[in-house]
Swiss-Prot record:
Name this polypeptide is given: Immunoglobulin lambda variable 9-49
Job of this protein: V region of the variable domain of immunoglobulin light chains that participates in the antigen recognition. Immunoglobulins, also known as antibodies, are membrane-bound or secreted glycoproteins produced by B lymphocytes. In the recognition phase of humoral immunity, the membrane-bound immunoglobulins serve as receptors which, upon binding of a specific antigen, trigger the clonal expansion and differentiation of B lymphocytes into immunoglobulins-secreting plasma cells.
Superkingdom of origin: Eukaryota
Region (Framework-3) residue spans: 77-112
Gene: IGLV9-49
Gene Ontology cellular component annotations, sorted alphabetically: extracellular region; immunoglobulin complex; plasma membrane
Species the sequence originates in: Homo sapiens (Human)
Amino acid sequence: MAWAPLLLTLLSLLTGSLSQPVLTQPPSASASLGASVTLTCTLSSGYSNYKVDWYQQRPGKGPRFVMRVGTGGIVGSKGDGIPDRFSVLGSGLNRYLTIKNIQEEDESDYHCGADHGSGSNFV
């Protein structure tokens, strides 16, 4: 029976490494030109320390990295060409992307994704 504690330890380590965060994002948001909008990406319970990447995807184009956000705000730097009107904030399980003074070129789909070491989840 000496193997039982070892087996339980291995199972708990494997279970922890295979678990993945689930991300949820409201289906849509809209705002007028010149206004501001805040988009929310929510991590599943137990993943409050995870960082989330925000991406912008214009019709017919591939995703473009906007910036990474953790509980302390931006992590690293913004993606190439992302204006200062874009900002992020992290609080608890929520990761926010705010766009101020919305311009026509901001009209896009915005997705969030979390890298959990064994792959990535996107919504």
